[in-house]
Structures are given as structure tokens and as C-alpha cells.
Amino acid sequence: VGSQLAAQLSRENHDVTVVEADKVRMTQLQDELDIMVIEGNGASPRVLAEAGIDQCDLMMALTNSDEINLVASISACKHNVPFKIARVSNMDYYLLDDWLSTKSLGVDLLVNPEFECALQIRNLLSVPGATDVAEFGGGRALLLGLEVQEGAPCVGESLMEMGIRLEHHDFLVGSISRSGRTLIPTGPTRLEAGDHIYIICLREHLDEAYKFCGLVRQPITRAMILGGSKVSVYLCKMLERMKIRTTLVEHDESSAEALAAELDNTLLIHGEATDVELWEMEGLDETGAFLALTRDDEENLLSGLIAKNHNVPVVIALLEKLNYVPLVNKVGVNTAVSSRLAIVDTILKWVRRGNILSLATLKGNEAEIIEFIATNKCKLLNTPLKD
């Protein structure tokens, strides 16, 4: 998470300093990014002083250790750092009466990667088949990523021609991913089968957007999840509220028993994550969504491939190694999610706050979608969008 944010903020001309305990990782960051990197423990007052905590405007504690992040945040408070963000995953901290509130700890934003990742998956399941989903306009408008199918109504025609033919269409193509390139479409742009397009539409016009790409939206009623990770637990509770029948497969017997006690309306199965016969016995062929959420990226990719070969409509894999993300489409998995990346948009939106209401970074796409308030100083006021 830290390296991703450091790269983005550095590109925006912020002076960025990263504290990194791993010497190999420190060297990589120095070679790849135009930032200052300090070797050491983020909870150490000496290291934080060396990193210039007295002069910083924003401190983000985003290590894998909640305790280091909390200690670093307390240090930032003592040094009167104006804004502080901490990554805290352990729900026990949130259950202590206001212990993590801004008043008691002084942290401005707390982020939970696993919860944000589960939320991202829930949103994807509410728009089946989409690879990306983001809400704008208080949830009234959606950005969704869809793949253009062979024979889709949009193939071959320019966007200008389609605009004339579909006089009252209520969606907008904002970006296209084609053969690894990102395109911002104009009137003459023609869509091709296999294009990955990002459409902005009102929630009530989702079916039109699907039809445009040659797809039919089928609501998810059953889901199968592999692995009893934190992401899985958060997601199961969300799916229970959505009335989606969910089966969770966990290989560790004691973990499966503990999860069965915690989850009310989720069917817990003790078994190996790659036991295809077990999946079939538990209704894989009738499942609308298969979610590979174990702690092993390779296992998630492999099981996702198997599920896709069983014609499961929606397959999502949890991948924490970001260099695996390009493999997703090649093995037939619909989309990948990452608990590390799930909080990036949340943090960036907060960092840029002010007039920015929402922000979405598109996977495998160099574009970024931003919802902002047009103030009196905005140069685009009273200017036709076509200009």
C-alpha cells in the first residue's frame, strides 16, 4: 500500500519520505521512485525524527502491524503533525469504546484493508460480470468495467454514430483498455470485440449498459467462497444481509468450527481448497459466483481457472502479489481484488479531499475517475463538454 501511494503522490509533485524496515525493499523503492527512503522501524522515535516528522503535513502508518501503526500515530500526535492516517485491521481495536476515535488517539482516518476489500467484492457481486465498480453521486451513478462481446451492438460503429442511432442512451463510455493501452474515446472512436470499456451510467440504466456490450445481467443468488480469511468473514456477513446463499470452504478444521459459530446463515464446509469433487458436491455448477479468497495467490488463480472451466458466471480471485494481476484475464478469471489496493482510493480521496467527492483508480488502466465540485473558479464553467 505504501509504495503504491508513494508513487502516486510523488507523481503529483509531493515531497514523499518512506520509512522501510526491509533493506531489499528500501533499495527497490530508491531505484524505482523519486522519493526519500529511510531504513528503520516506523515505531521508533529516532527513525521518525530522521524522516522529518516535525516538518511533515501528513503521516500515513500503513505497515502490516497494527501496533506499529498505532505507535507511529501517537508519535505523530506528539509532534503535532496536522493529518494522520493509520491502517488497523484487528477488529478488537474498533470494539473498544471510542479508543480509536480522533479525540482519543488523534488519528484522522482509520483504514481496514480487509473490510474495504470485502466491500469491493460485494459491490462487484451487485453488478455481476463487471470487473470494476465505483459509486458516484451518492450511489445514484455507477462506473463499471465491462468486456465488449463478439456481436455486441456497439462493435464496429463509432461512438458518434451510435449516439445518433441511440438518441436517448443514458450512459457514457469514459475509457477503453485495448491490448494493454488506455484510450480516452472521442466521437470517431470505434469499439472492438474484446475491448475492456468503462461506462458511467445511472443505476436504473444498468441493463442498457450491459446490452450495449452484448451482455445480460443475471443477479447472483448463490456464492461459493474458498478460504476463511478476514476478507471472507467480512464478505460472508455482507452476503448474509443480501440474502445470497453462501458456502464457505475452509481447510483447517478448527478454523472452520470457529467460523461456523461466528457466521449465522453461511454453510461451512471443512475441506481442501482444491478439492473439485467437494465443490461439485456442494453445488458448484449451480453457483452464480465463485470467490477464491485463500491466503495463497497461486491457489486462488488455479481454483479460479477450475471454476471458470465449470462455467461459473462470475469468478473473483484475491491476489496480493500485484505482478499476478495481468494473468487474471489469461486464465479466465473475471477480476482480481487486493486488500492492499482496496484502501488506496479511500486514502487518495481523503488526501485530496476539499472539492473531491469520489475517486476510482481503474485496474489495468492508466485512467483515474474523479467526482468533484465545480467551484466558481473552475475553468470549465459554462463550457460545452464537446469543447
Give the ranges of each region predicted by the language model.
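Cytosolic regulatory regions of ion transport systems
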Residues: 1-387
